[in-house]
């Protein structure tokens, strides 16, 4: 009764893509996919086919383009390939409910970063513009230090590690900020910060985060053989006082683990990398909504110390309960391979998604 009581809401793909007993499974209950784009013709073609299937299956996609070689007299660079994704998103819908959606990620050190930053500005060569996509820039600690010190910043081709150009870091930063002012994007993704937060067992396996997903609420490793998967749902913080000290959080973690298992069992070979990643890491994304409603209901100023204390209290409670249930699931069903030796079933547990539809 948690959903009917307004204590939590399913993510849209969980709610809309659950098949009826007699219905064939077409779309899947997964909100987020994170893909890696290799620097090869085979990899680019595979990525194009995979993201079409992922979109049809019902999920939004984040694509990580930082390793694709820069434009040269022998290579077109990543932008024309990203443009094909732009066209795909108008054709391949997310399951039954909404059009395809995609966010491209690129490192701040890539030689094509300026063109990438400007790809949503509707002037210039239309064949290299991408008005139907979202985009994000991976910002490193070294770049921010270069901005702080007003140093030059090297743009390095990922193919041969040669320096293609050197530009004032502050000039690039100004372009980022101006583009955000004009278009609302790119997202700012602090790539070193998220890699430091990766579970140690995953670091020990040589795994690395190359970017995030469509909505930037979760960071998971991607590689040639891994397309990361995360299934979402969110609790309603407005009714926190009603559901705290109930078994709801633990029940929801168990529920999402079951949803992930449904995906693993029904994902076809056309999205085998996503199925493999889900089996290895079993990432969940239990989120939250209604924080402003809780504060308004209790007449707590948004920026007050009381609000900060309550925020810490609530999310500490959610995290603690989630970890307890993941440990319990590991005892019952086994650890996932990426968390072997930790006593946990899931490598990730919490993710605060946008909740546009869920909030309604």
Q: What are these language model-derived features?
A:
Residues 1-360:
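Extended catalytic cores of very large enzyme megasubunits
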């Amino acid at each position: 009764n948690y959903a009917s009581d307004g204590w939590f809401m399913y993510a849209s793909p969980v709610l809309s893509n659950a098949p009826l007993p007699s219905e064939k499974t077409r779309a899947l209950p997964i909100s987020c996919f994170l893909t890696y784009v290799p620097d090869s013709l085979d990899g680019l073609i595979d990525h194009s086919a995979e993201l079409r299937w992922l979109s049809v299956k019902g999920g939004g996609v984040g694509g990580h383009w930082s390793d694709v070689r820069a434009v040269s007299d022998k290579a077109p660079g990543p932008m024309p390939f990203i443009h094909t994704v732009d066209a795909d998103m108008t054709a391949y819908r997310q399951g039954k409910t909404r059009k395809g959606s995609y966010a491209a990620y690129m490192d701040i050190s890539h030689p094509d970063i300026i063109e990438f930053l400007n790809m949503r500005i509707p002037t210039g060569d239309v064949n290299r513009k991408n008005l139907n996509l979202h985009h994000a820039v991976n910002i490193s600690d070294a770049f921010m230090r270069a901005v702080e010190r007003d140093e030059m910043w090297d743009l390095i081709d990922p193919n041969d590690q040669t320096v293609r150009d050197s530009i004032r870091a502050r000039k690039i930063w100004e372009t980022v900020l101006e583009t955000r002012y004009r278009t609302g994007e790119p997202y700012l993704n602090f790539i070193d910060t998220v890699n430091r937060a990766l579970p140690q067992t995953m670091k020990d396996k040589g795994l690395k985060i190359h970017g995030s997903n469509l909505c930037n609420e979760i960071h998971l490793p991607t590689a040639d053989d891994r397309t990361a998967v995360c299934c979402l749902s969110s609790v309603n913080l407005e009714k926190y006082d009603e559901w705290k000290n109930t078994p709801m959080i633990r029940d929801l973690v168990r529920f999402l683990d079951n949803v992930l298992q449904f995906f693993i069992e029904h994902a076809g070979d056309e999205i085998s990398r996503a199925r493999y990643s889900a089996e290895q890491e079993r990432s969940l994304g239990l989120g939250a909504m209604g924080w402003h409603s809780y504060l308004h209901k209790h007449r707590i100023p948004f920026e007050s110390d009381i609000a900060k204390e309550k925020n810490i209290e609530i999310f500490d409670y959610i995290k603690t309960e989630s970890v307890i249930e993941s440990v319990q699931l590991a005892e019952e069903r086994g650890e996932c391979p990426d968390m072997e030796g930790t006593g946990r079933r899931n490598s990730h547990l919490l993710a605060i998604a946008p909740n546009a539809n869920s909030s309604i």
